[in-house]
Amino acid sequence: MSLQRSEKEAVISEVSRLVAKAQTLVLAEYRGITVADMTKLRVQARSNGVRLSVLKNTLARRAVAGSAFDVLAGQMTGPLIYGFSEDAVAAAKVVAEFAKTNDKLVIRAGAFAGKALDVNGVKQLASIPSKEVLLAQLCGLLMSPISRTAVVLSALAAKKGEGEGVGQAQAVPA
């Protein structure tokens, strides 16, 4: 069943809107995957802010034309699922994690910052911690010297407080 021209234009418009917001696009072949597994993948993706779509490749190529993801146009062949995410690593992370447990989902390619990524590039991108984790690690690094200084000063104050009480005479209750 083919789509009417107006339906095709609506799909291209919707995908173009996703492409405009996305930082990352991941392509994965889903040949032979069960509906139950695909549903699990979609739920996992949705909870991580990733939009998964099964699209006609010609419509997808038209939607990415002139965008940073145009570098993937030549690889848009066969049964593909397209993962779009506004977070730089979310799409790669969701697809790569799911592909580890389900061999029917095969990562084909990806794009980030206008550069095409091969399978290994997508896996490397997936191994990078999320923005929130990186910010937490940075805060921990920035707070570490301050906390160490506070601990040292506290220990010095405690030691000095103990030293003051040694030479003083204590009053004996009558």
Curated annotation (Swiss-Prot):
Under the heading Pfam families, the entry gives: Ribosomal_L10
Q: Ribosomal protein: is it a keyword of this entry?
A: yes
Q: Which CDD domains match?
A: Ribosomal_L10
Entry's Gene Ontology BP terms: translation
* UniProt keyword list: Ribonucleoprotein, Ribosomal protein, RNA-binding, rRNA-binding
- Record's PROSITE patterns? RIBOSOMAL_L10 (PS01109)
On whether RNA-binding is a keyword of this UniProt record, the answer is yes
* InterPro entries reported for this sequence: Ribosomal_uL10, Ribosomal_uL10-like_sf, Ribosomal_uL10_bac, Ribosomal_uL10_bac_type, Ribosomal_uL10_CS_bac
What GO terms fall under cellular component here?
large ribosomal subunit
Give the domain of life: Bacteria
Q: Which GO terms describe its molecular function?
A: large ribosomal subunit rRNA binding; structural constituent of ribosome
User: What is the protein's known function?
Assistant: Forms part of the ribosomal stalk, playing a central role in the interaction of the ribosome with GTP-bound translation factors.
Quaternary structure note: Part of the ribosomal stalk of the 50S ribosomal subunit. The N-terminus interacts with L11 and the large rRNA to form the base of the stalk. The C-terminus forms an elongated spine to which L12 dimers bind in a sequential fashion forming a multimeric L10(L12)X complex.
Q: Which family does it belong to?
A: Belongs to the universal ribosomal protein uL10 family.
Q: What is this protein called?
A: Large ribosomal subunit protein uL10
